[in-house]
């Protein structure tokens, strides 16, 4: 058990260190280091516990200024480069940090990092999120940001250090006007999870859960397809306030954590297999005169 008196963690209340020690976003990197965001009013540190049991700490700066992060969310490791870490700041100084640790996570002196709290979408509209509740990266390396009023994406082609460009997905009204509305623009987005087919499961605070897919047309545009929308009325969701979503990658089972309990749904997308060492075929053997179904598992 790691506490302020026996670790590198700091308490929000120095006079009574065992009273309140806040940690967020714990995760292990590929080197076996445990990353912890140790936060509070006057504590803005990243703490790292090495495999050798040593605690290291450093602050994050952006353009020479130390960035306070009193209420950070999870740390999302970039799929393109594990040295890149995305850290959303949920409330109080709301924004998004990209940290590049240069492969030396216990040495903050050679890092580069940037904090942004303002973006402009494809139509030139300014976005300054009041709250950021969720962050995810899909298989195309697009960053999805869920806020208190809708969501936006940062395409993989955008250099976060050089540009504050983003995109907001548009749902066409199909009423002959060629007009559309931003996807879930009035919803609080509590969570975003990407499944094995690169579809997005989105949990909202008041409208249940959505499963959407992005289909690229011949002109390079993006069409948003709503595959499913689960609510209390049409499913077994115990509440329309979906706080968290998790997927069992090997089976595709989707778990919904709501304000009134937990429920799961068996979806049809699993993560691709790295090899074919665990193939399951039934029936086996298959004889030439067999006319029934053939089941093969382990290809994806």
PLM regions: where:
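Surface-exposed loop and turn segments in beta-propeller and other repeat-based domains
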Residues: 1-19, 56-68, 106-128, 160-185, ...
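Residue-level detector of Asp-centered blade-edge/turn motifs that repeat once per structural unit
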Residues: 28-31, 77-82, 137-140, 194-198, ...
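Short loop/turn segments immediately following the C-termini of beta-strands
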Residues: 31, 39-41, 46, 80, ...
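Conserved beta-propeller blade signature
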Residues: 33-37, 84-88, 142-145, 152, ...
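Blade-level signature of beta-propeller repeat domains, shared across WD40, Kelch, NHL, RCC1
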Residues: 240-274
């Amino acid at each position: 058990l790691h506490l302020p008196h026996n670790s590198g963690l700091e308490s929000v209340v120095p006079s009574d260190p065992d009273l309140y020690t806040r940690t967020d976003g714990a995760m292990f990197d590929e080197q076996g280091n445990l990353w912890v965001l140790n936060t509070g009013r006057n504590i803005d540190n990243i703490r790292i516990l090495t495999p050798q049991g040593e605690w290291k700490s450093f602050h994050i700066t952006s353009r020479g200024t130390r960035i306070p992060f009193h209420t950070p969310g999870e740390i999302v490791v970039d799929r393109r480069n594990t040295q890149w870490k995305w850290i959303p700041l949920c409330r109080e100084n709301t924004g998004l940090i990209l940290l590049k640790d240069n492969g030396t996570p216990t040495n903050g002196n050679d890092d580069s990092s940037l904090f942004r709290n303002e973006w402009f979408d494809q139509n030139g509209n300014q976005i300054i999120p009041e709250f950021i509740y969720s962050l995810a990266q899909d298989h195309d390396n697009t960053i999805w940001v869920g806020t208190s009023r809708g969501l936006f994406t940062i395409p993989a082609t955008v250099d976060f250090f050089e540009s504050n460009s983003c995109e907001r997905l548009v749902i066409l009204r199909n009423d002959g006007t060629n007009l559309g509305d931003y996807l879930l623009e009035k919803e609080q987005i509590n969570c975003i999870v990407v499944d094995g087919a690169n579809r997005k499961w989105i949990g909202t605070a008041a409208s249940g859960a959505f499963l959407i897919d992005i289909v690229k047309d011949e002109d390079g545009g993006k069409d948003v397809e709503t595959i499913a929308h689960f609510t209390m009325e049409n499913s077994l969701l115990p509440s329309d306030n979906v706080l968290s979503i998790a997927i069992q990658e090997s089976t595709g089972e989707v778990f919904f954590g709501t304000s009134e309990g937990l429920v799961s749904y068996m979806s049809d997308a699993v993560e691709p297999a790295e090899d074919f060492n665990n193939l399951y075929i039934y029936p086996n053997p298959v004889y030439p005169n067999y006319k029934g179904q053939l089941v093969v598992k382990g290809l994806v």
